[in-house]
UniProtKB/Swiss-Prot annotation:
Family annotation (Pfam families): GlutR_dimer, GlutR_N, Shikimate_DH
UniProt-recorded name of the protein: Glutamyl-tRNA reductase
Organism field: Cytophaga hutchinsonii (strain ATCC 33406 / DSM 1761 / CIP 103989 / NBRC 15051 / NCIMB 9469 / D465)
Catalytic activity: (S)-4-amino-5-oxopentanoate + tRNA(Glu) + NADP(+) = L-glutamyl-tRNA(Glu) + NADPH + H(+)
Pathway membership: Porphyrin-containing compound metabolism; protoporphyrin-IX biosynthesis; 5-aminolevulinate from L-glutamyl-tRNA(Glu): step 1/2
EC number: 1.2.1.70
Length: 425
């Protein structure tokens, strides 16, 4: 009997940030939790995906272990009474629902930013961690590779991944365009609001820029983020020295008056161009700065227009994306149904092989080596032809949803319940 595929999901859709932060898991914690679940349940296949927007556990079992898994998650994160917050979790106990959900997550349909490009790699990491612990079996291997192939189709056949659909992504995308002809470009990020932090992380995840510097009035958080992203941190007191070195300045400073005034910028030695991307409201870069030679400023409206256009393209592509997903799920379900009859097919092959070997053993001593070899080949060929039709009929019955009756008939005819699934030598 093939176990049901299920999922427990805590995401931005139902759970506030403070809850998501508490249950978020790193690689070591994901692996530790998978081993806990394996020890306390009968599940054979497990996958845990944890990002800033979701923590999800996928598992195979005919039992509903959602309560147990939530409790084990609480133990892993040292959260007392996590089960009391079960209303924040979505439970997918039907295989069709869990499979569809993982497809939508892996493709980016369920992301807070539709078409999120990071999620594919995050899913790949989760799959790798599962495989590292031998907790990815035939079902999960096939499912994950089907999702990865589906993602390639979505990229090739739709506009779902085109452009940057968030302000932070659009900022990184624009930066790449502006600095494409500038070798070893220097980028300075000023301010650490929510957008500034997202920009830092997106630079780390999606670009090859090496010379990125961060500065902020309050150094504690910015030093930690700089360490997380592997970028340089400089004191805010040295701001203008850093600005002088930068080819691009990205500002998300919360300030009533512009931090970067025309007068201060005018003091800089501008040899060619210096770009400012101003993500602040009110603006932190003086609107008059563009009057200066070599100074080019992009404000939040420009960035927002880029992200809005990309988001509109992605939303328009969703019907096509859903069709591609459904095509893949149909194909996966056909394979999954065939998996249900695989044990019966193996047992039938084993039963026939036993009969063949027993009969051969009665006569082989009377034959020469050459004769024995020929008889062995002939009987193997006969067996393969005998078994071909039942196998084809079983697979056809799978597609019609009628395999159970045929399985029962074969079990009775050949006493398959007593046969092992593996063919013995």
């Amino acid at each position: 009997m093939i176990s049901n595929f299920k999922s427990i999901s805590l995401t931005y859709r139902k759970a506030p940030l403070e809850i998501r932060e508490r249950v978020a898991l790193n690689e070591a914690e994901c692996k530790s939790l998978m081993l806990r679940i394996k020890d306390f349940t009968d599940t054979a296949e497990l996958l845990i995906l944890s990002t800033c927007n979701r923590t999800e556990i996928y598992y195979t079992s005919n039992e509903d272990y959602s309560n147990d898994i939530i409790k084990l998650l609480g133990v892993e994160k040292n959260i007392t009474g996590l089960i009391q917050q079960k209303e924040y979790f979505e439970i997918y106990n039907e295989q069709a629902d869990a499979v569809l959900h993982l497809f939508e997550v892996g493709i980016g349909l369920d992301s807070q930013v539709v078409g999120d490009m990071q999620i594919v790699n995050q899913v790949k990491y989760a799959y790798q961690w599962s495989a590292d612990l031998n907790l990815a079996g035939p079902f999960l291997h096939r499912l994950m590779h089907t999702i990865f192939f589906t993602n390639k189709r979505v990229v090739q056949e739709t506009a779902f991944r085109d452009g940057a659909a968030s302000v932070s992504y659009a900022t990184v995308e624009l930066s790449e365009e502006l600095l494409s002809a500038t070798p070893n470009a220097n980028i300075l990020i000023v301010g650490l609001g929510e957008i500034g932090a997202d920009v830092c992380r997106n630079f780390k995840a999606n670009t090859s820029f090496k010379n990125i510097t961060l500065t902020n009035r309050s150094p504690l958080k910015s030093e930690a983020l700089a360490a997380e992203c592997g970028i340089e941190h400089v004191p805010f007191e040295t701001l203008w020295e850093a600005v002088a070195k930068a080819d691009l300045v990205i500002s998300s400073v919360a300030k009533e008056e512009p931090l970067f005034t025309k007068e201060e910028i005018q003091k800089l030695s501008i040899l060619s161009h210096k770009y400012f991307i101003d993500l602040s409201v009110p603006r932190s870069v003086d609107a008059r700065a563009e009057e200066l030679p070599g100074i080019i400023v992009y404000d939040i409206d420009h960035i927002q227009n880029r992200s809005n256009e990309a988001l509109e393209n992605r939303l328009n592509a969703i019907p096509h994306v859903r069709k591609i997903i459904l095509d893949s799920i149909v194909e996966f379900n056909e394979w999954s149904k065939e998996m249900e009859v695989s044990p019966t097919i193996n047992k039938l092959k084993n039963a026939l092989e036993q009969i063949r070997k027993e009969e051969l053993s009665r006569f082989v001593k009377q034959l020469s080596d050459e004769e024995a070899k020929k008889v062995d080949e002939i009987t193997k060929s006969i067996m393969q032809k005998i078994i071909k039709l039942p196998v084809l009929q079983l697979k056809a019955a799978c597609k019609r949803g009628e395999a159970e009756t045929l399985i029962d008939v074969l079990n009775d005819l050949f006493n398959l319940d007593k046969q092992p699934e593996q063919i013995r030598d």
